[in-house]
Curated annotation (Swiss-Prot):
The gene is trpF. This is N-(5'-phosphoribosyl)anthranilate isomerase. One of its GO terms (biological process) is L-tryptophan biosynthetic process. Pathway: Amino-acid biosynthesis; L-tryptophan biosynthesis; L-tryptophan from chorismate: step 3/5. Belongs to the TrpF family. Its EC number is 5.3.1.24. HAMAP family: PRAI. InterPro entries: Aldolase_TIM, PRAI_dom, RibuloseP-bd_barrel, TrpF_fam. GO terms for molecular function: phosphoribosylanthranilate isomerase activity. It comes from the Bacteria. It catalyses: N-(5-phospho-beta-D-ribosyl)anthranilate = 1-(2-carboxyphenylamino)-1-deoxy-D-ribulose 5-phosphate. It comes from Nitrosomonas europaea (strain ATCC 19718 / CIP 103999 / KCTC 2705 / NBRC 14298). CDD domains: PRAI.
Length: 211
C-alpha cells in the first residue's frame, strides 16, 4: 500500500513545488496567526493555484472562530481542514469541507474513545504532547501508545525526519505521515535535500512492504 505524505508548514511556493516534485500527496498551511509558520490565506491561495491536480491543500487551525475558518478556507482554496486545538466534534463538523482532528498523544489518553468522539472526522492526526503547545514541536511520542485497531484512519506526526522515518514505518505500520520541522532549515523554510531524503526513505519502505 502506498504511504500518503503531507508536508506541513509551507510558506513559500518553491517549497511547495519541491514537496510536489518529490511525491507529497498534500501540502499543509498553518492558518493560526500565532504560529511562526503562519501564512496568510491570500499567499496560501496563490500557492494552491500552482498545485497539480490531486495534491490536496490542507489548512491547519488552532481554536479558530467559525468565521475565520470560512473566510480563510475559501480564500486559500482548501480541500481539507485540520483542527489542532480543543475544537469540539460539533464545531469541526460545521463546515462544507472534510476535516482531520489532531490529538496530542500521551499516557492516560484513550485514543479509542477519542476516535469514537470524532467519528465524523476523515481521520486522526497523532502528534506528540507538549504542555501549552498545540503542535510543531519536533518531539516524538511513544508509538507503542497507538492502539492496534483504531476505528478511524490515522496519520503519524510528531518529530519525524529522514533519520527516524524508517523506524516509524516499521514499528507502527502506518499508512499516512505528516512532516514539518523534520524537513526544515528554519521554521517555515523547507530544505529540498531533507524533503528528498525523507521521501526516498518512505518509498524504500513501500518497496520492502510490497516485496
Amino acid at each position: 500500500m502506498r504511504i500518503r505524505v503531507k508536508i506541513c508548514g509551507i510558506t513559500r511556493l518553491e517549497d511547495a513545488m519541491a514537496a510536489v516534485q518529490h511525491g507529497a500527496d498534500a501540502i499543509g498551511f498553518i492558518l493560526w496567526p500565532q504560529s511562526e509558520r503562519y501564512i496568510s490565506p491570500e499567499e496560501a491561495g496563490r500557492i494552491v493555484k500552482c498545485l497539480p491536480p490531486f495534491v490536496r491543500a490542507v489548512g491547519v487551525y488552532v481554536n479558530p472562530d467559525k468565521s475565520w475558518v470560512e473566510e480563510t478556507s475559501a480564500t486559500a482554496g482548501l480541500d481539507l481542514l485540520q483542527f489542532h486545538g480543543d475544537e469540539s466534534a460539533d464545531f469541526c463538523s460545521r463546515f462544507h469541507l472534510p476535516y482531520i482532528k489532531a490529538v496530542r498523544v500521551r499516557d492516560g489518553l484513550d485514543l479509542l474513545q477519542y476516535a469514537q468522539h470524532y467519528a465524523g472526522a476523515r481521520g486522526l492526526l497523532l502528534d506528540a504532547y507538549t504542555a501549552g503547545i498545540p503542535g510543531g514541536t519536533g518531539h516524538v511520542f511513544d508509538w507503542k501508545l497507538i492502539p492496534a485497531e483504531l476505528p478511524l484512519p490515522w496519520i503519524l506526526s510528531g518529530g519525524l525526519h529522514p533519520g527516524n522515518i524508517t523506524d516509524a514505518i516499521g514499528q507502527t505500520h502506518l499508512s499516512a505521515i505528516d512532516v514539518s520541522s523534520g524537513v526544515e532549515v528554519a521554521k517555515g523554510i523547507k530544505d529540498v535535500n531533507k524533503i528528498s531524503a525523507f521521501m526516498q526513505r518512505v518509498r524504500s519502505c513501500e518497496d520492502v512492504r510490497s516485496s
